[in-house]
Each structure stands twice: as structure tokens, then as C-alpha cells.
Swiss-Prot record:
Pfam families membership: Fer4_7
GO molecular function, one term: iron ion binding
Binding residues for [4Fe-4S] cluster 1: 71, 74, 77, 122
Catalytic activity annotation: a quinone + NADH + 5 H(+)(in) = a quinol + NAD(+) + 4 H(+)(out)
Family annotation (HAMAP family): NDH1_NuoI (MF_01351)
Descriptive protein name: NADH-quinone oxidoreductase subunit I
Reported function: NDH-1 shuttles electrons from NADH, via FMN and iron-sulfur (Fe-S) centers, to quinones in the respiratory chain. The immediate electron acceptor for the enzyme in this species is believed to be ubiquinone. Couples the redox reaction to proton translocation (for every two electrons transferred, four hydrogen ions are translocated across the cytoplasmic membrane), and thus conserves the redox energy in a proton gradient.
Residues reported to bind [4Fe-4S] cluster 2: 81, 112, 115, 118
Family the UniProt entry places it in: Belongs to the complex I 23 kDa subunit family.
Membrane topology classification: Peripheral membrane protein
Length: 174
């Protein structure tokens, strides 16, 4: 019994598989060509996908009603971040009732895994994962977001206010 097989017999084995694959491809091509309204593809720049309200996109620093940052530079978000992508530099505040505030708050989006641990760790609701997800950029420096980008970018229309006011927090003991 010979282990070697004839080349003509070997080529016959592949022919049904190739023809089956071509038939499947042609079936999908014709179906999509003549039923374009049923296609799942969106024309991206013109049409946008509707995401759930629970969608977690790019980070947002929330602001108070007076326009200042809600962040108290407690470093809990940076400590809780598994990717170690949050860098905060704190400074003392001029107001004696405020202990400290962030003078530098940076998030390296290329390292971030969008887990939401920073959002959960924050005791003052200062950081959230917002509804935006598009992050175009040319080089790596464009993906390190600072305070101005996180809290005051133009498409946020002046920042995102928190759900609970300071007075309501104080009454609730938060």
C-alpha cells in the first residue's frame, strides 16, 4: 500500500470546498446587493449608532455650579485604576474650607481599559465615563487628556454638572 497519492485525486478533494465557499460568497453578495435596506451596515459619518444611556465612553470631569472642578484630589481614582493611567498633582487651595484641589489631572487614554473603577471609587462624583467615544489623533500626545479637555471641552457645553448638589450631599451625609 502506497502512502503517496496521485496529484489528480488530491486536487479533486479541494474542488467541492472551494465551490461551496464561492457559492456562499455569491449568495451573500447578491442578497446584500439587492436588499440594501435590510443591511446592518451604517453609512458612518452621515449615520450614527444610537448607544445605550449606560454606555461608558471617554472620561469627563464634572464641575460645580460655579464652574470649578468637583475633584478634591483625593487620589482614589488613580489608586483604584488597574491600568495606572491617571496622574494627579494636588495643591493647597486658598480657601481654608477646601483642603486641596488638582492643578494637574491627566488620563492616558491609550493605557485606559475603560473599566469604570475610577468612576466607582470617586467619593464626590468628580469623574464619569461619558457618552463620547470617538478619539481621533495623529500621535500619542493627543491621547493624554488634561483638565481642560476632561472638564471644559466645547462639545460638553461648559462641563457636566453632577446629579446631586453640594447642599443635598451635605444633608444626605455624603
Amino acid at each position: 500500500m502506497s502512502v503517496m497519492q496521485n496529484n489528480s485525486e488530491k486536487s479533486k478533494w479541494f474542488l467541492p470546498g472551494i465551490l461551496g465557499g464561492l457559492a456562499t460568497t455569491m449568495k451573500h453578495l447578491l442578497k446584500n446587493l439587492f436588499n440594501q435596506k435590510k443591511m446592518m451596515t451604517l453609512n458612518y459619518p452621515e449615520e450614527k449608532y444610537e448607544y445605550s444611556p449606560r454606555f461608558k465612553g471617554n472620561h469627563v470631569l464634572t464641575v460645580k455650579k460655579d464652574g470649578s472642578l468637583r475633584c478634591t484630589a483625593c487620589m482614589l481614582c488613580a489608586t483604584n485604576c488597574p491600568a495606572e493611567c491617571i496622574k494627579i498633582t494636588a495643591a493647597e487651595h486658598n480657601d481654608p474650607t477646601v483642603e486641596k484641589f488638582p492643578i494637574s489631572y491627566e488620563i492616558d487614554i491609550l493605557r485606559c481599559v475603560f473599566c469604570g473603577f475610577c468612576e466607582e471609587a470617586c467619593p464626590v462624583d468628580a469623574i464619569r465615563l461619558g457618552p463620547e467615544w470617538q478619539t481621533p489623533g495623529v500621535n500619542g500626545a493627543n491621547f493624554i487628556y488634561d483638565i481642560n479637555h476632561l472638564a471644559y471641552r466645547p462639545n460638553l457645553k461648559g462641563g457636566i454638572l453632577t446629579h446631586v448638589d453640594d447642599e443635598e450631599r451635605h444633608k444626605a451625609g455624603i
